[in-house]
């Protein structure tokens, strides 16, 4: 949600309030392993599920938004900040049948977006955009699940989590 406090034909400046959630996940199948400084090595069969990992970051945020127009060109920028971000992850080790879950609260979240475009017509616009986000590295709690034995162990202040990411894109926008 954006409230514009400066608005002119060629520029706008406003304050933002919102909520953002970002998720990442990946898995490892097959491959080679090396533990204990190379003393224990081996191979997993191709296609065998080994590890699955998921991260979720959520944050209510405050921010600034701006737009500047020069003839058919425009530049749009946003900056978001939150001291209340929360990170969660799940680390699944399939072969050992164990799961680690971590939760970190009160992380700092920063995000910046810049979008540069050219208006081909009043409805059509081509643009390029870059966004960058950072969630600070902070300490949180971890829970260990031995799924085969049914054991659960909770460990306070034993997990650390952070995230940096960026995207670069280009597109065509059509307004109805």
Walk through the language-model features, giving the residues of each.
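Extracellular/periplasm-exposed beta-strand and loop segments of Gram-negative cell-envelope proteins
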Residues: 1, 21-57, 82-113, 135-171
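Internal, hydrophobic cores of structured domains that mediate oligomerization or house catalytic pockets
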Residues: 1-25
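Residue-level signature of outer-membrane beta-barrel architecture
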Residues: 2-6, 19, 66-70, 116-120, ...
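Repeated loop/turn-to-beta-strand initiation elements of outer-membrane beta-barrel proteins
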Residues: 10, 72-75, 122-128
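Transmembrane beta-barrel strands of outer-membrane/channel proteins
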Residues: 15-23, 30, 66, 77-83, ...
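Short, surface-exposed binding/anchoring microloops in extracellular/periplasmic proteins
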Residues: 57-60, 68
């Amino acid at each position: 949600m954006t409230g514009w406090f400066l608005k002119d034909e060629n520029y706008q400046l406003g304050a933002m309030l919102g909520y953002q959630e970002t998720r990442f996940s990946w898995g490892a199948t097959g491959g080679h392993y090396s533990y204990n400084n190379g003393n224990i090595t081996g191979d997993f069969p191709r296609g065998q599920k080994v590890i699955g990992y998921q991260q979720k970051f959520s944050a209510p945020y405050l921010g600034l938004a701006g737009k500047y127009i020069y003839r058919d060109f425009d530049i749009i920028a946003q900056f978001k900040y939150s001291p209340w971000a929360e990170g969660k992850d799940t680390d699944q080790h399939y072969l050992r049948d164990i799961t680690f879950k971590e939760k970190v609260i009160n992380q700092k979240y920063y995000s910046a977006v810049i979008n540069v475009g050219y208006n081909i017509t009043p409805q059509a616009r081509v643009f390029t955009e870059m966004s960058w986000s950072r969630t600070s590295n902070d300490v949180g709690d971890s829970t260990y699940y031995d799924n085969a034995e049914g054991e659960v162990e909770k460990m306070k202040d034993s997990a650390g989590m952070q995230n940096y990411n960026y995207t670069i894109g280009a597109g065509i926008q059509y307004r109805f």
